[in-house]
Amino acid sequence: MGKVRSIDLLGFLCPIPVHETRRVLQDSEDGEVIEVVCDDPETLHDIPALCDRMGVILEKVEEKDGEFRFLIANVTGELQY
């Protein structure tokens, strides 16, 4: 696993978590892993859809006590916008 960058989006409702995740991914480097922590249940659909659109790998989704943790890998550095 490459360098991990965490973004805390607890308390924000969609579309903010998706926009912030996209912004961080666009700024990410080849091999970097982005950890997104949020509590909006809509992100369970929206973040995986964003990963599909951008061509990145959603490595893991975890839920604990109403919080969701996504691990997203930019494996190529060549994102689709």
Model-derived features: positions:
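Intrinsic-disorder/low-complexity, polar/charged segments enriched in Ser/Thr/Lys/Arg/Asp/Glu/Gln
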Residues: 4, 31-35, 67-69
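Amphipathic, hydrophobic secondary-structure cores in small proteins
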Residues: 9-61
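C-terminal structural segments of small proteins and small subunits
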Residues: 50-81
